[in-house]
């Protein structure tokens, strides 16, 4: 039996228009990335990346996207992402770009990176707060995320101890 190795690209869709994120759909995003790969790398790139390519996770509120592709051709996908300058959906065209946050071998490593990334973003927001109410809400969010991570780690340790 052969194991197919994949790479996961954790990306952030950055746009000034909030309607851009809300109109996200995984099929539209998948076809946009495939078309961009075909435009940049030609038929070879389109054929090589079409096997095993998928949008594994999409969060329309935060703009986080997880793309899966074959390990041998992830650099073709990665190099085509800067050429995406707009998102076209339902007759509207929104200017945007992709910011690649992390490239990982498993979804789990991308999740761990995303937790750390979100924690850093919350700390930056905490430093830029002007209102005390905002500051308390962000501190609660940071504390909650730390507590959830500690519970996960203790749950993993308990599962290992039972084995």
UniProtKB/Swiss-Prot annotation:
Organism whose genome encodes this protein: Homo sapiens (Human)
Main location: nucleus
Listed GO MF terms: ribonuclease P activity; ribonuclease P RNA binding
The family this protein is said to belong to: Belongs to the eukaryotic/archaeal RNase P protein component 2 family.
Keyword Zinc found: no
Keyword list, A-Z: Nucleus, Phosphoprotein, RNA-binding, rRNA processing, tRNA processing
SUPFAM superfamilies: Rnp2-like
Miscellaneous remark of the record: The last C-terminal 19 amino acids are not required for complex association and RNase activity.
Pfam family, one: RNase_P_Rpp14
Gene: POP5
Subunit structure: Component of nuclear RNase P and RNase MRP ribonucleoproteins. RNase P consists of a catalytic RNA moiety and 10 different protein chains; POP1, POP4, POP5, POP7, RPP14, RPP21, RPP25, RPP30, RPP38 and RPP40. Within the RNase P complex, POP1, POP7 and RPP25 form the 'finger' subcomplex, POP5, RPP14, RPP40 and homodimeric RPP30 form the 'palm' subcomplex, and RPP21, POP4 and RPP38 form the 'wrist' subcomplex. All subunits of the RNase P complex interact with the catalytic RNA. Several subunits of RNase P are also part of the RNase MRP complex.
Keyword RNA-binding applies: yes
PANTHER family linked to this entry: POP5 HOMOLOG, RIBONUCLEASE P_MRP SUBUNIT
Gene Ontology CC, one term: nucleoplasm
Modified residues (Phosphoserine): 154
Example of a GO biological process term: tRNA 5'-leader removal
Protein name, as recorded: Ribonuclease P/MRP protein subunit POP5
Localization per record: Nucleus, Nucleolus
Function description: Component of ribonuclease P, a protein complex that generates mature tRNA molecules by cleaving their 5'-ends. Also a component of the MRP ribonuclease complex, which cleaves pre-rRNA sequences.
